[in-house]
């Protein structure tokens, strides 16, 4: 039974309706809910990344370049958008470090791309025939592209796909530019 791994990138309140929210991010929520309902079946694994910053955010390199505090651990803005998290009922926020916890998958990250996420997906490969890794979320041109590239680097023989209808960029132009960059790197872009 071939399994798909679905990675929902940073669909947190601060990126949708909060500090860094955009109309485009809000617009993809219903489409994503529908798509996740379809994909939440069989042996498929749905994973969520959570951008996670702390009180020292403004002192970090990211904070100096983007001086907008967001996704501070424990704040409402850090939580995953309710419509999205309610599709897959894993209970409370959960960060896992072992295969037995795999179905309760929350990967916390304080960087755009998560090496931990790529390592976890790679670690599944020996025992699980992964047919495809599908990414969706925000921002197309920052965290989606960063994670797609990392997964492709860690798992070169796995089909990495990005569902454009479930992604939003910092701007619509940057969204499209990121999709083109990913296509150049043999990441499949669907539903444009």
Functional labels for PLM-detected ranges:
Residues 1-106, 127-131, 157-161, 170-191:
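Active-site acidic carboxylates
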Residues 114, 167-171:
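Short, small-residue-enriched loops and turns at beta-alpha junctions
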């Amino acid at each position: 039974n071939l399994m798909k791994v679905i990675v929902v990138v940073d669909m947190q309140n601060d990126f949708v309706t909060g500090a860094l929210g955009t109309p485009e991010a809000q617009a993809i929520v219903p489409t994503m809910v529908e798509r996740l309902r379809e994909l939440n079946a069989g042996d498929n694994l749905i994973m969520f990344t959570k951008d996670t910053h702390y009180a020292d955010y403004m002192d970090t390199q990211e904070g100096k370049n983007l001086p907008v505090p967001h996704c501070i651990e424990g704040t409402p803005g850090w939580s995953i958008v309710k419509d999205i998290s309610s599709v897959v009922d894993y209970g409370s926020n959960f960060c896992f470090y072992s295969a037995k916890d795999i179905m309760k998958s929350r990967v916390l990250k304080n960087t755009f791309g998560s090496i931990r996420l790529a390592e976890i997906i790679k670690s599944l490969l020996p025992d699980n025939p992964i047919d495809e890794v599908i990414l969706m979320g925000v921002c197309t041109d920052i965290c989606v592209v960063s994670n797609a590239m990392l997964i492709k680097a860690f798992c070169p023989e796995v089909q990495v796909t990005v569902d454009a209808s479930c992604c939003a960029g910092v701007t619509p132009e940057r969204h499209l530019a990121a999709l083109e960059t990913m296509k150049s790197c043999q990441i499949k872009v669907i539903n444009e």
